[in-house]
A protein has these predicted regions:
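Acidic, metal-coordinating catalytic segment for phosphate/diphosphate chemistry
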Residues: 1-42, 48
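A generic structural micro-feature
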Residues: 35-37, 111-118, 138-143
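A short coil-to-beta-strand element that immediately follows conserved catalytic motifs
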Residues: 90-100
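Active-site-adjacent beta-strand/loop module that shapes the phosphate/pyrophosphate-binding cleft
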Residues: 103-133, 147
């Protein structure tokens, strides 16, 4: 899967990280920071210029559905589970790898100092009807809900949130970056084919 971008939180220096050594040792060699790696699967479901997204009221942003891959799952199994839980999607099919997005950010739990988040993004199709969701408690309290949204409207909305927010979160930057790539590559291709 092609790597689109590697993003670093402002508190993490790229000079401190050497991925080949990190993966073998579990340490960031220049700083002795403890690093953990987490894999996520994210779904890209596009119909014309509309895309299936999650709107989160707490952060007032749009994001791709998906999340962490559970132990024992492969990426596709994690993708299908996350789409079902977060959007109620059924009949997930025609799954194809699209791109990967890597992030290094501080980790605030005692088991590590830095998390290397690897987001595996897949295009897919789903049944037209969305069923019931199965949100985790924090997703409910954050006001998460699935929406079909014009991709260009979602990009403009997220850009406005970034421009007007003092917090510069890596998550919204990742989501907006991915939406722009999807719009440029997938939505533009669909228009040319039509």
């Amino acid at each position: 899967m092609r790597l689109l971008k590697t993003a670093f939180h402002p508190d993490i220096s790229p000079a401190d990280l050497f991925p080949e050594e990190i993966l073998q040792e579990g340490l960031c060699p220049a700083s002795n920071l403890k690093l953990i790696e987490r894999h996520a699967a994210r779904g890209i479901v596009v119909k014309g210029e509309n895309i299936l997204l999650l709107f989160t009221q707490r952060y007032h942003d749009y994001s791709l559905p998906g999340g962490g891959i559970d132990e024992g799952e492969d990426e596709i199994e994690g993708l299908i589970r996350e789409l079902k839980e977060e959007t109620g999607a059924a009949g997930v099919r025609n799954v194809k790898p699209f791109a990967r997005y890597d992030e290094y950010r501080p980790w605030y739990k005692p088991d590590a100092d830095v998390i290397h988040m690897i987001s595996h993004c897949y295009t897919c199709e789903i049944d037209d009807e969305l069923g019931d969701t199965a949100y985790e408690s924090h997703e409910v309290s954050n006001g998460m809900k699935p929406v079909w949204m014009n991709i260009h409207v979602a990009i403009a909305h997220n850009e406005e949130v970034i421009a007007n927010s003092e917090k510069k979160g890596l998550s919204i930057e990742r989501e907006t970056f991915m939406l722009k790539v999807i719009a440029a590559e997938l939505v533009a291709d669909m228009k040319r084919e039509a």
